[in-house]
């Protein structure tokens, strides 16, 4: 701060002496000492600064031929206070081809400068120089055909003194103030990076300001603002300072920017540049900061406006400037068309990729059967999907697909619920069928058991057979007979005279003929004879058939039943295991014999 104050004192003494036609030796020595100290500070700042990419505002100003002329009047609303250092009087210059290369000024910390920082611009001609300013931490680059001079004044008290003495020169409004912002730093458009003017073929000496000049300046500064948005990517190379120089035929988009002044002091402080002071403020991020990257100083005599065409701030292009006149709108429209075509091409490619992914998704969800074109389907749902994917933008497509997926999932949930209900109904039907089948099996088992019992009873009844006298061809006899009333047979008392009557029934067995003896009499007799011959030991061994059984067999054989019936009774008798079974069997035998 002390160095800045000292420098300001030297400049004030320099300006006070400039009014006189002659300058003493002391003032000249002060100027030389100031220049030497400035160069040493520049070398020190350059040695301390490595790979920072900062650009500094020059404090050394060179000037060429000058001619006395009136102050140029511009048709713009922004105002800069122009100052020429190192000369006896102030001069303003105008370039020959009216085109100035774009110059970039960036602060060391790119933060906002204090409210006391201020830009004073003087324009010279035919200088190509790049020199740093250690006090302000900025650097300016100038080409041979495009010249501009800037100075930073940080002392508020001395700035007020300068404002009372200096003449504010009207500077054309900017043709391009792109909203550049890097690393979250911004200066609200108060840092000026380049100024361009037209060349009138001569340089003019700035005369003293009058009240009429100030009133005219106020009237011009009260014009309405006009803003025109520009894309941020056009000035990326300018912000970074490493971009390649582009073709000068490409015109950068224009942002008309005018400062609306409030009072004479406000009008004199027309433009402030953000620089790094002793205490640099912290960079502020957001949408506030908009760096001024291109300025054009216009001549009042020519009604046309030009644009700055340089895209590289570190490598100034010399001798290749392009004036824009009536063909400006054509170039702007061409650039806009190119950008629009590029964006449309990107949007089209993105939309195509999105549509392909959407078709695959729809195929996986089951909305469509194959990945063919959606236009081939006649289903209303698919037609609706095709219309949305072909016409809507990406956001609408995303919303539509989200809704479609939700609808498909809900549809699937409904189908799942229906399937679950059908499965439950099938389960209940199967349970009913199982119950009926079980009942049927039980009934069949009962019927089978009943049939088997009936068959067993039938077998027992059929084994009895029929009467002997009954003819065989007469047919089947009933198994169950009902007892009818039978005539009672009177018992005849035995009379010995009955034997003489010749009735065989009345003849006793002992007197019967040998021919009518039973067949098994021989067997019986043989058994008796064998038993007599056996020893006493053999008699003690139990025999297979007892005497009772033998006698019963003899009785059955002597009956009047058929041979088949006799054999069946004998077989049943052999199977009997108890006396009760034998008695029951003999009762049945007696019934059969009595029934005949």
From Swiss-Prot:
Please note every region of biased composition (Basic and acidic residues): 88-97, 151-168, 233-249, 331-352
According to its UniProt entry, what is the function of this protein? Answer: Essential cofactor of the RNA polymerase L that plays a central role in the transcription and replication by forming the polymerase complex with RNA polymerase L and recruiting L to the genomic N-RNA template for RNA synthesis. Also plays a central role in the encapsidation of nascent RNA chains by forming the encapsidation complex with the nucleocapsid protein N (N-P complex). Acts as a chaperone for newly synthesized free N protein, so-called N0, allowing encapsidation of nascent RNA chains during replication.
The entry describes its oligomerization and partners as: Homotetramer. Interacts (via multimerization domain) with polymerase L; this interaction forms the polymerase complex. Interacts (via N-terminus) with N0; this interaction allows P to chaperon N0 before encapsidation and form the N-P complex. Interacts (via C-terminus) with N-RNA template; this interaction positions the polymerase on the template.
Q: Where is this region: N0 binding?
A: 33-41
> Quick one: which gene encodes this?
P/V/D
The organism of origin for this protein: Bovine parainfluenza 3 virus
Specify where the region named Multimerization lies, as residue ranges. Answer: 374-441
Its name, as the record gives it, is Phosphoprotein
Q: Where is the composition biased (Polar residues)?
A: 1-11, 38-66, 74-85, 127-144, 270-324
